[in-house]
Amino acid sequence: MMKLTCVLIIAVLFLTACQLTTAETRDEYRAVRSSDEVRNSRSTRDCSGSGYGCKNTPCCDGLTCRGPHQGPICL
């Protein structure tokens, strides 16, 4: 039983590696897309996007910080 489990785990790892190396674009493989989304998440960006607060973080290019002093947002 343990041999079968090991063979299955190795097969799954091999198939996953094949999908990663043969995908033509990153959009084809979900795990790559997910890691990119985490990397580009709001907490790791240097600027605030449209609709996000800009009190402590500057707005991204092309956006302007507007609104009341207590809670301005990027527009």
From Swiss-Prot:
Residues 31-50 are annotated as: Disordered. The presence of a 'disulfide through disulfide knot' structurally defines this protein as a knottin. The cysteine framework is VI/VII (C-C-CC-C-C). Residues 24-45 form a propeptide. This is Conotoxin VnMKLT2-012. Residues 31-45 have a biased composition (Basic and acidic residues). Expressed by the venom duct. Belongs to the conotoxin O1 superfamily. Residues 1-23 form the signal peptide. GO terms for molecular function: ion channel inhibitor activity; toxin activity. The lineage of its organism: Eukaryota, Metazoa, Spiralia, Lophotrochozoa, Mollusca. It is found in: Secreted. Its main location: secreted. It comes from the Eukaryota. Keywords: Disulfide bond, Knottin, Neurotoxin, Secreted, Signal, Toxin. The keyword Signal applies. Disulfide bonds join 47-60, 54-65, 59-74.
